[in-house]
UniProtKB/Swiss-Prot annotation:
Function of the molecule: Catalyzes the condensation of the acetyl group of acetyl-CoA with 3-methyl-2-oxobutanoate (2-ketoisovalerate) to form 3-carboxy-3-hydroxy-4-methylpentanoate (2-isopropylmalate).
Pfam families attached to this UniProt entry: HCS_D2, HMGL-like, LeuA_dimer
Record GO terms (molecular function): 2-isopropylmalate synthase activity; acetyl-CoA C-acetyltransferase activity; manganese ion binding
Protein name from the UniProt record: 2-isopropylmalate synthase
UniProt pathway: Amino-acid biosynthesis; L-leucine biosynthesis; L-leucine from 3-methyl-2-oxobutanoate: step 1/4
């Protein structure tokens, strides 16, 4: 059996279904380009028929991202499939991913169809998709709760109809590793034609078993794993692809399998997805968490200092985590700055480099010791890929225990400097009310989070906000970075407002 496992990334489709996550087209393109650098085999760019915005994003990914298969999701009906093809047809390699539920509970309550009707719909959908492309994936939604004999029968029929990938999702995260492995073995054994196709798995994390189930499945013969970066997704999320990949990489002695993933790009991909979705990575998360390679216990520290492999089964460099050392200072030049950014995986054009270097010089005057983490946060904050309708020019705060907090600030809009002041319930609230007065946009703050990038009194503060506007149902995510927490808070809110305005235009 082939020992190559294909990695199917659904961060832009299933991952974006996480509550409170809403990515614009440019953000989806950023993630897609990084996924291509990471080396995933397939990017599921979205569900084109759901909205014009989703269609445009899938189409943009298909047009602009090369070296990877781009998939569009479609229900098992002709209209969905036609729209999916229109969105992905300019891809270097295009895949239509069509699905229908197969469990009795879904047939009875959701589809209101009998088993024969579902088989007919699945076969017709695959045949229709094959008119457009030779790469067609069929998914049996809620497969893990479906009758095995019926599942094998529908798989046999869609293989005859032309499906090249068969996906067996654990849609509600119900199964367990041993059970799922046997399920996969039974499907491979009982279904004629399986030797012609790639068997795929798509696991959800409702019981915290998505990665374990995915690894059990590839051990049983599956050769494609679907999941999302950082494990994001609706409800409890999807299998975290970085964990699946490093599980196979670290335990190749056990699995004997390989992927095409460029593992040093894992950490940067995780950071990018976290930054753009506004979903922080928990510190103790496997592979990419802040504490994944930290050792607190004296016994552990002593062991690692003597020999890393005493307590580290992976080393940080394998996933792209660099040592947090002093790298640059205020006397560092543009060439050294560019070289260090490229070592960290950032390849900026001239305009982006000029912006980032100007920001670096300002930071270097405020902060004596600049680390890799500082540089990463600064560059990710500076390079936003949307036009700034408003730019924060200055900020003044009056606050104290016996003073009503007041913010005065100026926002540059083209050639005009707009200035206002407002009081609030705390300095951050005062800032946001002032921004609302200037922009004329009334927003609800859904979430506010702050994180210190590094230690010390001059640490960079990284603020993420989520806002919802009365005129739009979407949530907009903004990010701001500064050694001054209030300035970072203001920049994050203005960034979110700029995204909202860009979306409305």
């Amino acid at each position: 059996m082939n020992n190559r496992v294909h990695i199917f990334d659904t961060t832009l489709r299933d991952g974006e279904q996480s509550p409170g996550v809403s990515l614009n087209l440019n953000e989806k393109l950023q993630i897609a380009r990084q996924l291509a650098r990471l080396g995933v085999d397939i990017i599921e760019a979205g569900f084109p028929i759901t909205s014009p915005g989703d269609f445009a994003a899938v189409q943009a990914v298909a047009r602009e991202v090369r070296g990877v298969t781009v998939a569009g999701l479609a229900r098992a009906n002709f209209k969905d499939i036609d729209v999916a093809w229109d969105a992905i047809k300019e891809a270097e390699q295009a895949r239509i991913h069509t699905f229908i539920a197969t469990s009795d509970i879904h047939l009875k309550y959701k589809l209101r169809k009998d088993r024969e009707q579902v088989i007919e719909a699945a076969v017709a959908a695959v045949k229709h998709a094959r008119k457009y492309t030779s790469d067609v994936e069929f998914s049996a939604e809620d497969a893990s709760r479906s009758d095995i004999d019926y599942l094998c029968r529908i798989f046999q029929e869609v293989i005859k109809a032309g499906a090249t990938v068969i996906n067996v999702p654990d849609t509600v995260g119900y199964t367990t590793p041993g059970e799922y492995a046997q399920f996969i073995r039974d499907i491979l054994e009982k279904t004629p034609g399986m030797e012609k196709i790639v068997l795929s798995v798509h696991c959800h994390d409702d019981l915290g078993l998505a990665v374990a189930n995915s690894l059990a499945a590839v051990g049983a013969g599956a050769r494609q794993v679907e999941g999302a970066i950082n494990g994001i997704g609706e409800r409890a999320g999807n299998a975290a692809l970085e964990e699946v990949v490093m599980g196979l990489y670290t335990r190749k002695d056990y699995y004997g399998l390989m992927t095409g993933i460029n593992t040093p790009e894992i950490y940067r991909t995780s950071r990018l997805v976290s930054s753009l979705t506004g979903m922080p990575v928990q510190p103790n998360k496997s592979v990419v968490g802040k504490n994944a390679f930290a050792h607190e216990s004296g016994i552990h520290q002593d062991g690692v200092l003597k020999e890393r492999t005493t307590y580290e089964i992976m080393n940080p460099e394998q996933v792209g985590i660099t040592a947090n050392n002093l790298v640059l200072g205020k006397h560092s030049g543009r060439h050294a700055f560019r070289d260090r950014l490229e070592e960290l995986g950032y390849h900026l054009n001239e305009e982006e480099l000029n912006l980032a270097f100007s920001r670096f010089k300002v930071l270097a005057d405020k902060k004596k010791e600049i680390t890799d983490h500082d540089l990463q946060a600064m560059v990710e904050d500076e390079i936003k890929h949307i036009p700034d309708t408003y730019v924060l020019k200055y900020l003044h705060i009056s606050t104290g225990t016996a003073v009503v907090p007041t913010a005065t600030l100026g926002l540059q809009m083209g050639d005009e400097l707009k200035e206002e002041a407002a009081c609030g319930d705390g300095p951050v609230d005062a800032i946001y009310k002032t921004v609302d007065k200037i922009t004329g946009i009334s927003c609800t703050l859904v979430n506010y989070a702050i994180n210190a990038i590094t230690g010390g009194k001059d640490a960079l503060g990284d603020v993420t906000v989520k806002i919802r506007c009365e005129e739009k149902e979407k949530v907009y995510i903004g990010r701001g970075v500064s050694t001054d927490i209030l300035e970072a808070s203001a920049k994050a809110y203005v960034n979110a407002i700029n995204k909202l305005i860009h979306d409305m235009q």
